[in-house]
Amino acid sequence: MRTHYCGNLNKSLAGQTVELCGWVNRRRDLGGLIFIDMRDREGIVQVVVDPDMKDVFEVASQLRNEFCIKFTGEVRVRPDSQVNKDMATGEVELLATGLEIINRSAALPLDFNQTNSEEQRLKYRYIDLRRPEMSDRIKLRARASSFVRRFLDENLFLDIETPVLTKATPEGARDYLVPSRVHKGSFYALPQSPQLFKQLLMMSGFDRYYQIVKCFRDEDLRADRQPEFTQIDIETSFMTSQEVRNVTERLVHDMWKELLDVELGQFPVMPFSEAMRRFGSDKPDLRNPLELVDVADLVKDVDFKVFSGPANDEKGRVAVIRVSGGASLSRKQIDEYGNFVGIYGAKGLAWMKVNDRAAGFEGVQSPVAKFLNEEVINAILERTQAETGDIILFGADKAGIVSEAMGALRLKLGTDLELTDTSAWAPLWVVDFPMFEEDGEGNLHAMHHPFTSPLGVSAEELQANPAAANSDAYDMVINGYEVGGGSVRIHNAEMQTAVFGILGIEAQEQQEKFGFLLEALKYGTPPHAGLAFGLDRLAMLLCGTENIRDVIAFPKTTAAACLLTDAPSLANPASLEELAIAVKLAEKKDA
């Protein structure tokens, strides 16, 4: 039906007759001529309809926004005075010789000239996606997927599919369950990742695997999460963690260069402990210059229990953030930041303004200064390298609360005070994660997943002191977003059984849930390691947006609903009966 895309017309086509298909972006009647801005996925071109072409002119006079149309015409170069430098096709226009209305459009439920609500945009997503901004994002995502396949194919990785209907395994979130009609009362689970199948592929001898795959997690959503999401899943045999990092870093480096013409450089590597100490996060945004500084040793002997208590608690932490020029913050602003850290469990936010650094103790202003002697204050000023005009903000509590609260405050200050360089790219690797983390009841949980190999310890050593072990795991972080995570996997049954035991999974449960894996580990399993990227998050960063819904064609809401199709919906009673399922809804309690 067409010979060219609207957005691809240029001066090299001058004098040629072309056929275009697309939509009316805008219609203007000027000086007896009709001008149509015609749009397709590649862009917009101006079409001129001359009244001398009576039949065409008559049809063109009926056009309204979003009519689906076909134009035939001659490409001609615009006079210099009429060149539109704001359009990629601004040097040319199409002189129409034929026009067909393929389909008319009703009045649009969205107005492209104003901001529409998120609900309306999702309900009429097929219209929202016509906007050039949205179309460009989906196209860039497609280019990213194509690049990944090409890169991995060239590096001898095999694209292998794994099952979607599989067995529920504990991977940190709730599973989406699918009832079996044949095996009544039994359920499949949609995969949270292809983790075990890709490990089994390594045991099968396919030493370089990849897959761009849908995964599913029934968890509470936020801006960078969806119930169904897309992973770039990678697994290798006979490669160390360093070698896996090298090839996947090169993938991202080359992707940014090809798609954005951005040179990322070599990614720095940072241990988990350093990331938490300096930034209060295992996915630090290195574009932000603010850092956490520990001062527990300086305040452990003061009479102020708010500081000395955590300073003398082995599970406590006292850390500060020095904000250059922050002494200009008002008391109201400081109180608002105090309320902000309260969201993360902090009991308050002590502060100290440095009005005159040269005056030392006499030059600071703080409600807690009276509890601190001159020696302590001078030591804090020295350690933080504070200068006149700065403010020092204090966090003192359990280490986890301080790290999370002050880490979040660091990000907020970076945004509010425009300290974060939003034009920069700051990738890094975070490595040497703890093997396990403790919940509030003292139970250990795998920080990544239970198939991650510990770093440099035997099964016996791990069992003797599991809380001290680190894992051979690694996360790729870009601008404060974890875009990929992976690890070396356990490749012998003894270590895997030991890890299950530490996690409180008894022998019988191990066999019920993971018997197939433990059996497979008996038969010459190679050492293997891998990584999975979140394609949605990568695309989000590439497109310069902050919400993965912007780079997914048909996303869900934060309530995991599809406003376009009204999913999820009630099932047909006959279907439920066939599956031997009865739905019992919780009764609403009277107020």
Curated annotation (Swiss-Prot):
Q: Which family does it belong to?
A: Belongs to the class-II aminoacyl-tRNA synthetase family. Type 1 subfamily.
Give binding positions for L-aspartate: 171, 217, 448, 489
Q: What does this protein do?
A: Catalyzes the attachment of L-aspartate to tRNA(Asp) in a two-step reaction: L-aspartate is first activated by ATP to form Asp-AMP and then transferred to the acceptor end of tRNA(Asp).
A GO cellular component annotation here is:
cytoplasm
Task: Indicate yes or no for the key word Aminoacyl-tRNA synthetase.
Answer: yes
Q: What are the start and end residues of every segment in region (Aspartate)?
A: 195-198
Q: Which UniProt keywords apply?
A: Aminoacyl-tRNA synthetase, ATP-binding, Cytoplasm, Ligase, Nucleotide-binding, Protein biosynthesis
Keyword ATP-binding listed? The answer is yes
The highest taxon in the source lineage is Bacteria
> Which coarse location class applies to the principal site listed for this UniProt protein?
cytoplasm
Where ATP binds, per the record, is at 217-219, 226, 482, 534-537
Q: Subunit comment for this entry?
A: Homodimer.
- Which subcellular locations apply to this protein? Cytoplasm
Protein name according to UniProt:
Aspartate--tRNA ligase
A GO molecular function annotation here is:
ATP binding
Catalytic EC class: ligase
HAMAP family documented for this protein: Asp_tRNA_synth_type1 (MF_00044)
Q: Which reaction does it catalyse?
A: tRNA(Asp) + L-aspartate + ATP = L-aspartyl-tRNA(Asp) + AMP + diphosphate
